[in-house]
Amino acid sequence: MAKIGVQSNLSDVQQELQSKGYEVVQIENEQDGQDCECCIVSGRNADVAGISVPGQMSIIHAEGLSAEEIGQRVDEIVTQH
């Protein structure tokens, strides 16, 4: 299953994605997100969180979304790749 990076303060999102079978890694810096299909961050700007992502990696901004909504977006991203 796809590897998904999740900012450490989003434990409900981590649990949702693990229940869907995704490999979840906590991201605290740009190295943590390498090799991930996409990353989920809590704010609008990943750079503010100290996380920069390489190339065309998808970023999901968790602000205002439920864990279930984020899980659906991850499903869409993974099926497109």
UniProtKB/Swiss-Prot annotation:
Pfam families: UPF0180 (PF03698). InterPro entries: UPF0180. Belongs to the UPF0180 family. This is UPF0180 protein ABC2430.
